[in-house]
Design a protein with these regions (language model features):
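Surface-exposed, charge/polar-rich loops and edge strands
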Residues: 2-277
Length: 277
C-alpha cells in the first residue's frame, strides 16, 4: 500500500514538472513571437522612413536645381489645358509676369500664419493671425496681352488688413513669381464659399471661377527676401525663395524617425535572443 502511494505521488510530481516545463516553453515561444513580430514591424518602418529620407532629399535637390535656372517670362496660359501644361513644365522655376492687378477681385485666404524663413514668422512679437492675398492680374505687352492669371501676393496680418495697410499698387507691375499648385483640403478645413468669396484653402479652379477666368487659369506666387517688407511694414509679405524647398516633414525628421524604429528593432532582437537562451 505504501509503495503504491509513493509511486502515485512520484507520478503526480512528474506530471506537474512536465506541465511546468510545457507552460514555460509556451510562454517562451509566445514571447519570441511577440518580440519577433515587433522586430519585423519596426525594421520595415525604419526602412520605409529611410526611403522617404532619400526621396525627400531628391525632391529638394530637384527644386533647388530648378530655382537656379535663369528666370523666364511666364508663357501664355490661354486655351484649354494650356494652364495645366504651363504649370507642370515650370514647377519651381523663377518666372516674371507683367500686368495690372485687379484689386476689385481680390480674395483673402485663411486664416494663415506667416510664411517660414521670414522675420514675421521668427519674431515672437509679430501677430501670427493673418491671411494670404490672391489678386487677378491682367497681362500687358506681347502675345500674352489681356491674359489673366491669379497672383498669390503674400501674407498680411489681420490687424494690418483691418487697418487698411495692405499695399495695392496701381499701374503696370512686373513680378517675380513661381507657379503654385492647389492645396488639398484638410479633413477639418471648411469648404470654400466661391459665391461669397470666403476661401479657407487654395483651390486654383475655385479662385479662377471667382475671378471670372476661363480655362481654370494658373496660380502664381510672388517671391521676395522675406525681410524688407516686414521691416518697412509693407504688406503683403512675399514668401522668400528659401521657403520654397521646405516640407512639413523635413529630411531631418525622416532620419530621426528611421533611427527610432531601428533602435526599437535592435531592442526587440535582444529580447528575442534572451528568451531563446
Amino acid at each position: 500500500m505504501r509503495r503504491t502511494f509513493a509511486h502515485a505521488r512520484r507520478t503526480v510530481r512528474s506530471l506537474a514538472s512536465s506541465a511546468g516545463e510545457s507552460g514555460g516553453s509556451s510562454r517562451r515561444a509566445g514571447g519570441v513571437v511577440l518580440f519577433g513580430g515587433m522586430v519585423a514591424t519596426t525594421l520595415y518602418l525604419g526602412t520605409w522612413q529611410t526611403r522617404r529620407y532619400f526621396w525627400k532629399t531628391q525632391l529638394i535637390e530637384e527644386r533647388e536645381a530648378s530655382l537656379r535656372r535663369a528666370p523666364a517670362a511666364l508663357p501664355s496660359t490661354s486655351g484649354p489645358g494650356t494652364a495645366a501644361a504651363v504649370a507642370e513644365a515650370n514647377a519651381f522655376r523663377l518666372l516674371t509676369v507683367r500686368g495690372m492687378l485687379d484689386h476689385d477681385r481680390e480674395v483673402k485666404v485663411g486664416p494663415r500664419s506667416p510664411p517660414k524663413h521670414t522675420a514675421a514668422h521668427d519674431d515672437p512679437l509679430c501677430e501670427k493671425n493673418g491671411f494670404c492675398i490672391v489678386t487677378p492680374l491682367r497681362r500687358t505687352g506681347g502675345a500674352q496681352q489681356g491674359e489673366r492669371v491669379l497672383v498669390h501676393r503674400g501674407w498680411v496680418p489681420k490687424s494690418a488688413l483691418d487697418a487698411g495697410k495692405l499695399d495695392r499698387p496701381t499701374g503696370e507691375v512686373e513680378l517675380s513669381v513661381v507657379v503654385l499648385a492647389s492645396e488639398e483640403q484638410g479633413r477639418f478645413t471648411p469648404d470654400n464659399e466661391v459665391a461669397s468669396g470666403h476661401f479657407f484653402w487654395l483651390d486654383t479652379a475655385a479662385l479662377a471661377q471667382r475671378a471670372g477666368i476661363a480655362d481654370g487659369g494658373v496660380l502664381v506666387q510672388t517671391v521676395g527676401d522675406g525681410a524688407s517688407n516686414w521691416k518697412q511694414q509693407v504688406w503683403p509679405l512675399a514668401k522668400p525663395v528659401a521657403a520654397l524647398t521646405d516640407f512639413y516633414v523635413t529630411r531631418e525628421k525622416h532620419a530621426g524617425y528611421a533611427a527610432t524604429w531601428y533602435s526599437l528593432a535592435f531592442a526587440g532582437a535582444l529580447m528575442s535572443v534572451r528568451l531563446l537562451r
